[in-house]
Every structure is written in structure tokens, then in C-alpha cells.
Amino acid sequence: TGEREALAHGRLLVLVNDGSLRNLIPAELAKGFGFLQSKPASGFSPVAVTPDELGAEWRDGKVHRPLVTHLNGALFGRPDAGVDMTFSFGQLVAHLAKTRDLCAGTIVGSGTVSNRENGGPGRPASEGGVGYSCIAEQRTVETILAGRPSTPFMRFGDRVRIEMTDELGRSIFGAIDQRVRGPA
């Protein structure tokens, strides 16, 4: 399947928050089961849209709009989803289809939305940059630049809100709004 043909099979676009429970990952990997207990259920936006609904913001198999993330009410990031996206959805789907059949309902994620700055890592939104969509990425950049991370991982009670709006500020997909809860 070529990239153009693969892209034509994509029917709906949706936002996804694929979180990780970072403190559980090492022990889970040691058990040999992979990320089983360290990957909670993903959060999905309440609305899926067809690519044509995005108009000019959908081009080259990418969504060209800022993905806005707030952490505990403060802006954490607003990187443009189409800028610095390594592979288009056409490329991703074509690559996946090389070794498997992709049936109706298959969800293909593009990975973390991130933008570079001047050829290097981005800057936090709190420092005037576009920020990040992933706490682990911000912590990695902090470690590279300062020798250690300063941004904590989310804790019980913390809240994340992820949304993409159109040029008039209207929500395109609705918001993913999640709070970290303790064990049931």
C-alpha cells in the first residue's frame, strides 16, 4: 500500500492522551510482561472529525494546528501538530500495512506532538517557548540542559487538559480532561 492510498483509508481524526505510569515501568519490564500495568487506559477526545472538516489545516497527511495542554490549569505546551512531525499519517499507515491487515476501527497514533526551536530542543511555555505535550520530554530536556529534571511527574490529584481549537478558538475535538486518581 502506497502512502497516498494508505492516507485515503483514514476516515476520522481524534486526539489521544497515551499516558504512562513512569514509576511502575522498571518493575513491570523486569517481570517480562512489558508495559502492562504501567500503561493506563488512554484518554480520547469526545469528538472525532473527518480530515476535510479541518480544511487547509489538514495537508500532507498532517494536522497543522497547535495542540494545547494545560497542567493543573497552567499552560504546559502549545506545539503545532504538523510542524516537526517526522512521518505523515499516510507514511505511518503504509508502513504498518506492510506486515499486517488494518481493519476498520484501527487507531494509528502519530506519537508525541513536539516542536524544536532553532535546531535544538524546545523551551517550556513558562519560558516563552511553545512548551511540550509530554512531561517526560520536558524532563529529558531539563536533564540535558541542567543535569537534572525540575518538572515533577504528575501526582494524585493533578489534572491535565488537552485540546485543539480552530482559528476562532472553537474546540475541534472537544477536550481530554483527566485527573490522576489513586488505586481503586
Report each predicted region and the residues it spans.
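Glycine-enriched loop-and-adjacent helix/strand subsegments that border the catalytic/binding cleft
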Residues: 1-95, 99, 123, 133-136, ...
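A generic structural motif
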Residues: 70-72, 163-167
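Active-site pocket scaffolds in enzymes
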Residues: 106-157, 163-165, 174-177
